[in-house]
Amino acid sequence: MDVSHGEADIGIRCGQGDWPGVNKTWLMDEEAVLVCSPRLVPPEKIACGDWLATQKLIHDDTPHPGANFPSWDDVLRTVNAPGALESRLHINSTSAVILSALSGRGVAIVRHALVKQLIETGQLVQLHPDHRWPLTWSYYLVTPQHTAMREEVKIFHDWLLHDVVSDNP
């Protein structure tokens, strides 16, 4: 649906916020994190570069234009896991990358907002929790630029804005 052409009254977009024809309200910034299935990693290895270097690395080949998404080389260098195995799985769907990590196929670099609840419920483990990679993408609430917001849309807009801000201080 194209909010800028009035096909929807409101939407949430992730990007750099440079969309024509919409009013935008910043919701939250995004960052990348390392995750895997809890079945894959012993608890004492969650922040261990040597353990990570032995794992299959899941690549999200989905385009992330302008997001400054970290490469595996950047991540491995940051967490001190040089000489990682070249065992890599390339997937061109972010949701399939997350499903692969959930099923124990390997370790993935993913957008935190997409897996936050899975981490909180223990379905995924965030590896190296002291390391996060800020992206240049943020989440925005968008509405058509030249259309007055209907009352029910305004109520939803305000509720969502309050809910997101209270969850992301």
Model regions: which residues?
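Loop/helix-junction capping segments adjacent to catalytic residues or to phosphate/diphosphate-binding pockets
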Residues: P42-P43, G66, I109, L118, ...
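Ligand-binding "clamshell"
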Residues: W19-K24, M28, L118-H128
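Acidic, Gly/Pro-rich loop/turn segments at junctions of secondary structure
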Residues: M1-N68, D73-H90
